[in-house]
Amino acid sequence: MNDLTGQTVELLQTLIRNRCVNDGTDASGNETRNADVLRQFLGGTGLELQQFGPTPQRQSLVARIEGTDPTAPSLCLMGHTDVVPVNAAGWTRDPFGGELVDGPSGPEVWGRGAVDMLNLTSSMAVAFRHLATTGFRPKGDLIYFA
């Protein structure tokens, strides 16, 4: 695996293992665990990071790479960090194990949210951090929200 792929896999595994299960109640989700992981992952890039949400345990993270033209349109990379409840009987592996296994077409990460949508949330975070650390400046603002 190349470095960016490896970072994506590790971040995805961490997000899965945090068990941010949203059952539709205000007390569920605990997305702050994943927002904190993303804050740490994007930290040290010089980006302004903001965390907010309706309750202390239901936080989201926003980061922005400022564009060079304030009149240019912005682009938002948006994901979510919660998952729906699990019926353990329907799983052959631990749904919160984040296991990296050999699949038919190569390595696969198994776990709740691995394909909806923690995979995209983690890959966008890795790409966003890579752009930020290489000095990339888009014409319009580039925003990461999860």
Give, region by region, the residue ranges found by the protein language model.
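Active-site metal-coordination/substrate-binding segment of hydrolases
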Residues: 71-143
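N-terminal helical capping/dimerization or prosegment-like subdomains
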Residues: 1-88
